[in-house]
């Protein structure tokens, strides 16, 4: 049989990546379309998406290219960055990422594809790593409790300010800020304070002694390196009912007294120098630690210790009632995504080095700084006296010094025309000291100076208390030991390297390896965020091109990539709306309409902008109630600032009236904010900027393939129409009407290559097909499960968008089995649960994404059908209403292999509810975790070893 010769163009197959990213092949797509009753993807799309919002033309983006072609293109971009030796400091320091951590955490999908650990039983490994992080931060700061990461140090400082405002006895509205905090921290404080009517006063610690304030923020050591003694100031602030917040450096705290020892109430900082590269500003894991009295007002996630159903220690997210997904506008913060992956890296860095290793790194860094200071003084140069790693070099011609430094491939901190800063770090060498001294005309005989030079640490502030005494920080110091420890933790968890994660509103899609590769290139990782612009030309091109891609995908006119989470993107968008109204003399507009189905970050972000939240209703079909929006827009016409909606809705449908809703809000002077959480249902199909929306945030860690990392990092770009463009966040040192919302001008810049790679490899047609298959996969699940579970809401033609809500509330009435029981039973089948009880209590929201194959969808469907059969057995009396596999799920290997089995159902049903599980089975490390016990007995540090010993002995 002869074959028709293929052309070279046919064989080149530039769209190969599209077929790798999209799970179902064309044959499977045809079968699935047949199940949902549509002839092709375009027909299905037409049946789902309202005609008045559909894009009339394809995305004006290039065609798809191969992985190899895309990697070559981004390599050329990366090569435009120039890597200098960086001594800039200002909160960012050189560090060596241990290769065992680089390969087995940062480059390991078992870690980077996991989701936030809401389902405790399948997140024990990740939560152990995070509780190590919390212990690290609490120990070094001298605090009683620490959280599981914040977005960056400056954001953490702003959160410390609002925590102090909530918690202080003082009725003052003034917050005093040390004039030697990092400049980016001061910028963030100004952004956060203004909408909340908090008065910032900036000055010296001595001036703070005379200030009436609800709190102070001190930098320790300060931004210029000086280590101050602030004990008297802390006493004075406490005497007037205020709180003391401190921004600090974890490495320095191995040598100098912990802030908690001299009166701090709240301590924040950045863990970046614990093994995480500069990355042009991020992502890095910040932290907050505080006294136990303030734990219930503390922002961010907290990992705590509880017990499971067998009485064994188990980790869980604790005190969640503080958070935005529960308390909404009354939450302590709008924080959702944080920096879990980077916190895990920092915690493993501490585990690997241990207290002795960290102290050695700190001592070596300090010795190099002290030797350099001595060399400079010998040449008549003025240098600060009490420092850890940073020298404030004064009375010089700074421009001349910078010119010499640049010629030598060195970056120093620019302070003013007569001063520079020099920060040493783990990567600094003897040769660096010699080269740095030479810039000032000094000679450095390192050994001679070392012998003759005393430390520059203040004797009255030396650390005397032990830290990191738990065995986990004193055991895994060989590479084999750490490798096996990290593997043991990863094996406890479910991530996307094992299974689909069908979380609604979370878009857990493929994070392709080719997309991830550029992240670890030094051309991206080794660029300091404050390096001269000519050294970051590659980043400038990458940012410009990615912004243009996002503008095209959304229909807006301008984008800021600064927000480093979706919640920060919301905040930036609402600040833009607020500033726009003020520019028009309408500062009184402060009402934000938000549907009752909205994500919890929406009202929390509105509150942070000083807006008053007014909740609007949803109708019986799950749509936002258009009449209620019109009525409330009219009622609050003079004060209406904005409407926040999610589209498609959080109920999983394309609402027909979105254009009319936008028109109604605009008619009363308001702006429309469209939450971009569900943008994966829109790319290549519809553009919010074209149907009347004024601003959106996007989630690059959802729609555009940045991995979730177990709870961060993320990027939440803010996209706006042209009239709001002047009110996007400014850059550090730049001009603008709205301040910064992240510490770095371009946020988590080093992970932007992931989204650039995704768009470049998918191309215009591939992005549209991805959206269409996401719609298909969700409708396929809804259709196949229809005989077993009701889909709560559907849109036009009885179809859903990219996710569906399964209503299991009727089953609870007939069997006593609720959504949580089903979620836990899915663990026995090797699945992460869908989103539980959001946006409707007692339901499960399923979002499969386009990356899941028909085989994986069918595996999930089979599990859900089997669970329905188990529920039916309860309804029929064949299984006991209390003693059944759903009520006792998940089942551990220890339980099902125990010599005694006390349940009324067989072990095989518990462990292997489907035959396929006998070939491949995930065993949860703990049984169902007791949430009530965990909140009543809050413990957020490493578990004592004897707790495990008791478990073994039992």
From Swiss-Prot:
Molecular function GO terms recorded: glycine binding; glycine dehydrogenase (decarboxylating) activity; pyridoxal phosphate binding
Keyword rRNA processing: no
GO cellular component entries: cytosol; glycine cleavage complex
Positions carrying N6-(pyridoxal phosphate)lysine: 702
Catalytic reaction equation(s): N(6)-[(R)-lipoyl]-L-lysyl-[glycine-cleavage complex H protein] + glycine + H(+) = N(6)-[(R)-S(8)-aminomethyldihydrolipoyl]-L-lysyl-[glycine-cleavage complex H protein] + CO2
The entry's keywords: Oxidoreductase, Pyridoxal phosphate
Cofactor entry: pyridoxal 5'-phosphate
CDD domains, per the entry: GDC-P
Domain of life: Bacteria
Stored InterPro entries: GcvP, GDC-P_C, GDC-P_N, GDC_P, PyrdxlP-dep_Trfase, PyrdxlP-dep_Trfase_major, PyrdxlP-dep_Trfase_small
Enzyme category, top tier: oxidoreductase
Oxidoreductase listed as a keyword: yes
Enzyme Commission code: 1.4.4.2
Gene3D superfamilies tied to this protein: Aspartate Aminotransferase, domain 1 (3.90.1150.10), Type I PLP-dependent aspartate aminotransferase-like (Major domain) (3.40.640.10)
Any GO BP: glycine decarboxylation via glycine cleavage system
PANTHER family, A to Z: GLYCINE DEHYDROGENASE (DECARBOXYLATING), MITOCHONDRIAL, GLYCINE DEHYDROGENASE, DECARBOXYLATING
Subunit: The glycine cleavage system is composed of four proteins: P, T, L and H.
Role: The glycine cleavage system catalyzes the degradation of glycine. The P protein binds the alpha-amino group of glycine through its pyridoxal phosphate cofactor; CO(2) is released and the remaining methylamine moiety is then transferred to the lipoamide cofactor of the H protein.
UniProt cross-references to NCBIfam families, sorted A to Z: gcvP, PRK04366.1
Family the UniProt entry places it in: Belongs to the GcvP family.
Name the record gives this protein: Glycine dehydrogenase (decarboxylating)
């Amino acid at each position: 049989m002869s074959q028709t010769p293929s052309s070279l163009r046919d064989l080149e197959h530039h769209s190969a990546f599209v077929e790798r990213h999209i799970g179902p092949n064309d044959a499977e797509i045809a079968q699935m379309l047949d199940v949902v009753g549509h002839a092709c993807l375009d027909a299905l799309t037409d049946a789902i998406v309202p005609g008045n919002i559909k894009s009339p033309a394809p995305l004006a983006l290039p065609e798809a290219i191969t992985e190899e072609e895309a990697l070559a293109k981004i390599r050329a971009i990366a090569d435009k960055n120039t890597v200098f030796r960086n001594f800039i400091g200002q909160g960012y320091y050189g560090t060596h990422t241990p290769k065992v951590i680089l390969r087995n955490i940062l480059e390991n999908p078992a870690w980077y594809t996991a989701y936030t650990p809401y389902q405790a039983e399948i997140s024990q490994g990740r939560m152990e790593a995070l509780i190590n992080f919390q212990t690290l931060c609490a120990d070094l700061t001298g605090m009683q409790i620490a959280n599981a990461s914040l977005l960056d140090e400056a954001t953490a400082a702003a959160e410390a300010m609002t925590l102090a405002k909530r918690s202080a006895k003082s009725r003052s509205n003034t917050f005093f800020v040390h004039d030697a905090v990092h400049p980016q921290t001061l910028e963030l404080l100004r952004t956060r304070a203004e909408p909340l009517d908090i008065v910032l006063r900036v000055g010296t610690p001595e001036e703070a002694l005379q200030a009436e304030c609800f709190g102070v923020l001190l930098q320790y050591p300060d931004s210029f390196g000086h280590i101050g003694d602030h004990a008297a100031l802390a006493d004075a602030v406490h005497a007037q009912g205020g709180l003391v917040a401190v921004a600090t450096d974890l490495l320095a705290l191995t040598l100098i007294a912990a802030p908690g020892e001299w009166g701090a109430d709240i301590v924040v900082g950045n863990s970046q120098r614990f093994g995480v590269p500069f990355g042009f500003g991020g992502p890095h894991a910040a932290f907050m630690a505080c006294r136990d009295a303030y734990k219930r007002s503390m922002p961010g996630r907290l990992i705590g210790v509880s017990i499971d159903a067998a009485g064994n220690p188990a980790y869980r997210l604790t005190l969640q009632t503080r958070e935005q997904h529960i308390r909404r506008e009354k939450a302590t913060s709008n924080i959702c995504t944080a920096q879990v992956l980077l916190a895990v890296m920092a915690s493993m860095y501490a585990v690997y080095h241990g207290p002795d290793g960290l102290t050695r790194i700190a001592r070596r860094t300090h010795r190099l700084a002290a030797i350099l200071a001595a060399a400079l003084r010998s040449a008549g140069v003025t240098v600060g006296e009490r420092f850890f790693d940073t020298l404030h070099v004064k009375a010089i011609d700074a421009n001349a010094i910078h010119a010499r430094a640049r010629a030598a491939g060195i970056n120093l901190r620019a302070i003013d025309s007569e001063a520079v800063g020099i920060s040493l770090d783990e990567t600094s060498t003897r040769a660096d000291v010699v080269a740095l001294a030479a810039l000032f005309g000094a000679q450095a005989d390192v050994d001679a100076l070392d012998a003759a030079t005393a430390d520059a640490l203040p004797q009255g502030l030396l650390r005397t208390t032990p830290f990191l005494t738990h065995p986990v920080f004193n055991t895994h110091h060989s590479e084999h030991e750490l490798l096996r420890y990290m593997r043991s933790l990863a094996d406890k968890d479910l991530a996307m390297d094992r299974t689909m994660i069908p979380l609604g509103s979370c878009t857990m899609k493929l994070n392709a390896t080719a997309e991830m590769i550029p992240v670890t290139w030094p051309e991206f990782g080794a660029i300091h965020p404050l390096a001269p612009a000519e050294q970051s030309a590659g980043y400038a091109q990458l940012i410009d091109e990615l912004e243009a891609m996002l503008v095209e995908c959304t229909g807006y006119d301008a984008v800021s990539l600064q927000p480093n989470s979706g919640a920060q993107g919301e905040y930036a968008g609402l600040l833009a709306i607020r500033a726009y109204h003020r520019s028009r003399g309408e500062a009184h507009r402060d009402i934000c309409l938000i549907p009752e189905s909205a994500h919890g970050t929406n009202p929390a972000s509105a509150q942070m902008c000083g807006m008053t939240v007014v909740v609007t209703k949803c109708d019986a079909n799950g749509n936002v109630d258009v009449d209620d929006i019109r009525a409330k827009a009219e009622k609050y016409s003079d004060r209406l600032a904005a409407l926040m909606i999610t589209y498609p809705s959080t109920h999983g449908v394309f609402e027909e009236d979105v254009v009319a809703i936008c028109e109604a809000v605009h008619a009363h002077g308001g702006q429309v904010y469209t939450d971009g959480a569900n943008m994966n249902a829109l790319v290549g199909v519809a553009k919010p900027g074209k149907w009347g929306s004024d601003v959106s945030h996007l989630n690059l860690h959802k729609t555009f393939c940045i991995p979730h990392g177990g709870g961060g990092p993320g990027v939440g770009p803010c996209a706006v129409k042209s009239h709001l463009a002047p009110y996007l966040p400014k850059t550090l040192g730049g001009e603008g009407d709205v301040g910064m919302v992240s510490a770095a001008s371009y946020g988590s810049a080093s992970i932007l290559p992931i989204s650039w790679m995704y768009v470049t490899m998918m191309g215009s047609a591939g992005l549209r097909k991805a959206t269409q298959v996401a719609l298909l996969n969700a409708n396929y699940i809804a259709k196949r499960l229809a005989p077993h579970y009701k889909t709560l809401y559907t849109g036009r033609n009885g179809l859903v968008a990219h996710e569906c809500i399964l209503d299991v509330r009727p089953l609870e009435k007939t069997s006593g089995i609720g959504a949580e029981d089903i979620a836990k039973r899915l663990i026995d089948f090797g699945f992460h649960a869908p989103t539980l009880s959001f946006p409707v209590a007692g339901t499960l929201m399923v979002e499969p994404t386009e990356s899941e194959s028909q085989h994986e969808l069918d595996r999930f469907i089979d599990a859900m059908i089997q669970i329905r059969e188990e529920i039916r057995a309860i309804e029929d009396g064949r299984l006991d209403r209390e003693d059944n596999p759903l009520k006792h799920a998940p089942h551990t290997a220890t339980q099902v292999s125990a010599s005694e089995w006390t349940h009324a159902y067989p072990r095989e049903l518990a462990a292997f509810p489907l035959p396929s599980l006998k070939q491949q089975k995930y065993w949860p490390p703990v049984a169902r975790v007791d949430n009530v016990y965990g909140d009543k007995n809050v413990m957020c540090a490493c578990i004592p070893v004897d707790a495990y010993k008791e478990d073994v002995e039992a």
